[in-house]
């Protein structure tokens, strides 16, 4: 599990591991590109650096899909969301629009694009809205992801609020806030 340290908190990025688990379970033999950058690269950069280096230079500015699975006859875009479901619903159609403009994916330009939003549990409003966007909602998660999902509601208990207040006071005392 990737842990990102900032001045005030330790954040866990669980979605990349979860997507890897999902692909291993459901698409074990498929070609997969994790955190695949999408979209065009500016012509100015291609002229200045050449196409390969321009792609590397511009990568931080390009959006990334959690996973792109190359299936026989289709491309599958997978975006996983533990909590921010609206972000996943909104991003997937944009990502699909960027695939034909992505130089690294031009060979797949004519393939149909499927979009899967991976959720830990069924969320009724997401399932209701997804078909209008061409998104299929998939609910699959290992136990450790379900635990994270269940723990999210506990962050607003009196006990959790008290722990946050104590932590904030300590950070302030140490000069971080």
Give the ranges of each region predicted by the language model:
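Charged, terminal alpha-helix-loop-beta segments
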Residues: 1-177
């Amino acid at each position: 599990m990737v842990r990102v340290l900032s001045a005030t908190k330790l954040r866990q990025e669980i979605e990349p591991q979860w997507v890897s688990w999902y692909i291993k379970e459901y698409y074990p033999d498929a070609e997969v590109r994790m955190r695949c950058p999408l979209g065009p690269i500016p012509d100015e950069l291609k002229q200045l650096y050449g196409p390969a280096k321009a792609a590397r230079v511009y990568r931080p500015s390009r959006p990334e899909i959690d996973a792109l699975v190359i299936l026989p006859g289709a491309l599958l875009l997978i975006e996983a969301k533990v909590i921010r479901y609206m972000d996943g619903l909104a991003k997937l159609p944009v990502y699909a629009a960027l695939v034909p403009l992505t130089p690294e994916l031009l060979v797949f330009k004519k393939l149909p694009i499927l979009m899967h939003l991976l959720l830990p549990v069924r969320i009724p409003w997401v399932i209701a809205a997804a078909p209008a966007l061409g998104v299929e909602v998939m609910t699959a998660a290992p136990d450790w992801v379900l635990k994270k999902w269940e723990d999210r509601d506990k962050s607003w208990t009196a006990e959790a609020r008290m722990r946050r207040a104590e932590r904030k006071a300590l950070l302030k005392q140490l000069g971080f806030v």
